[in-house]
Design a protein with these regions (language model features):
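Flexible, glycine-rich active-site loops centered on histidine and acidic residues
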Residues: 112-114
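N-terminal pre-domain/capping segments
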Residues: 1-108
């Protein structure tokens, strides 16, 4: 028997605040999402609190302590950049994002087009 689909929340309305330093911390958003009583949180790779890899295990533990998981990481690299060096930077950042996804326990790393 396969697992039933689960619901995960994505903070669409708070992306700008979660990307900016000193606006909304990932921990504050996790607490807000916990009130929805959902099993999962979809994350975005450019949230400010994800910049330091030392934060990844702490964030994962915080999510799990709240009774949730991170089933998917959302990323938006731009592989269409004509300049080879800049395009390689995007590839390298995506590799970094895949590593971050694994560290956070995400089973999927979704790549948005662009």
């Amino acid at each position: 028997m396969s697992a039933k689909p689960q619901i995960a929340a994505f903070p669409k309305g708070w992306i700008k605040d979660l990307v900016a330093p000193d606006k909304l911390s990932i921990y504050e958003w996790i607490d807000m999402a916990g009130a929805m009583e959902i099993p999962g949180l979809e994350m975005y790779n450019n949230f400010h609190d994800f910049k330091d890899p030392a934060n990844w295990p702490k964030i994962r533990r915080y999510v799990e302590a709240a009774g949730m998981t991170i089933p998917m990481m959302c990323c938006s690299p731009d592989f269409t950049i004509p300049d080879p060096e800049l395009r390689q930077q995007q590839v390298d950042h995506e590799i970094h994002s895949i590593r971050m996804s694994a560290e956070l326990g995400a089973k999927l790393c979704r790549v948005l087009s662009g």
